[in-house]
Amino acid sequence: MKKIALIIGSMIAGGIISAAGFTWFAKEEPPAEKTSTAERKVLFWYDPMYPNTRFDKPGKSPFMDMDLVPKYADEESSASGVRIDPTQTQNLGVKTATVTRGPLTFSQSFPANVSYNEYQYAIVQARAAGFIDKVYPLTVGDKVQKGAPLLDLTIPDWVEAQSEYLLLRETGGTATQTEGILERLRLAGMPEADIRRLIATQKIQTRFTLKAPIDGVITAFDLRAGMNIAKDNVVAKIQGMDPVWVTAAIPESIAWLVKDASQFTLTVPARPDKTLTIRKWTLLPGVDAATRTLQLRLEVDNADEALKPGMNAWLQLNTASEPMLLIPSQALIDTGNEQRVITVDADGRFVPKRVAVFQASQGVTALRSGLAEGEKVVSSGLFLIDSEANISGALERMRSESATHAH
């Protein structure tokens, strides 16, 4: 009986000791998980889409269908930039790109238009009064060759001057007198071929033929046989067809990239098989006040006259700048008041920096200043980081530093 009681007592004592030991070990276990989460002090909650609006408790954003994000006290720092939970940056697909140095390439097509070459333009006039004897079968739009007859006419003043010339020759007039009469005929517009014929034949001519002075297309011609013609009346207007002009309007912001004709590729929808040769180009000095564009004029060979004035054309401009600092265009934040990027420093902090933009093309932006080659900039997921920088005061510190450097 005593033995049984001793065994039971030993079991009870062992249970008490085990319970006490478990209690002691439980008290000594460090509450690591609890301190890692519960002890982080939350300053406020906010919606990244509206970072300036703060909330005192978690929940759904009243602006967007998303959970509010906590702002922790241990994230506050006087250092430049902000530090963001890597889980958040990964979930939002934050990506970075390296600032590089290289040429900014530009390639764009511009609508263009074919027109007459205004340097090849002739006006045929009657420099003395007379009347039209014959009009050759021509009209506006007809092509003529140099020397082709346009009309026959009689001009009394020319007939009278010829009579004076022949009279001087017969009466022994001096060379100076006869040459003076011939010069008067030239100034009155009598064709040189008719003057030579007068000298050779010594006979008065009463009918004269006005001819085309150049190859081209008639753009004005409205005369009929029997009509009187006054001094200085326009008989015809003729435009040359080789070369022609092709003009295009280009933005004034890319004028600095236009350097030589090798940058241009010209195509005409009406003749897609034709290879066009550009003789020379000119960037006209005037800027269109409404569109802020410059007129680019190309002089194009047109020996076969395949290019017709009024045709549509396309001008492809391919060019590149000198080496410059380049970043992806999506890395740029342009508020209208300032342009900035988010850089990543050696400690992994996101630091906003102001930049000066020079030009952008094909998804790449060239910078004047603000960054150095090799720096890292955020190219995707900018919104969260920029909002965080705004909340943490990093943007204000950036602006203060910029103002200090400016002074």
Swiss-Prot record:
GO molecular function terms listed in the Swiss-Prot or TrEMBL record: transition metal ion binding; transmembrane transporter activity
A Pfam short name: HMBD
A GO BP entry: plasma membrane copper ion transport
Gene3D superfamilies the record matches: 2.40.30.170, 2.40.420.20, 6.10.140.730
Reported induction: Transcriptionally regulated by CusR in response to copper and silver ions.
Positions in coiled-coil regions: none
Alphabetized InterPro entries for the sequence: CusB-like_dom_1 (IPR043602), CusB_D23 (IPR032317), HMBD (IPR045800), MFP_Cation_Efflux (IPR051909), RND_pump_MFP (IPR006143)
Keyword terms of this UniProt record: Copper, Copper transport, Ion transport, Signal, Transport
Gene Ontology annotations for the cellular component aspect, listed alphabetically: membrane; outer membrane-bounded periplasmic space
Signal sequence annotation: 1-26
PANTHER family: CATION EFFLUX SYSTEM PROTEIN CUSB (PTHR30097:SF15)
Function: Part of a cation efflux system that mediates resistance to copper and silver.
Subunit structure and binding partners: The cus efflux system is composed of CusA, CusB, CusC and CusF.
Protein name: Cation efflux system protein CusB
Annotated organism of origin: Escherichia coli O6:H1 (strain CFT073 / ATCC 700928 / UPEC)
The encoding gene: cusB
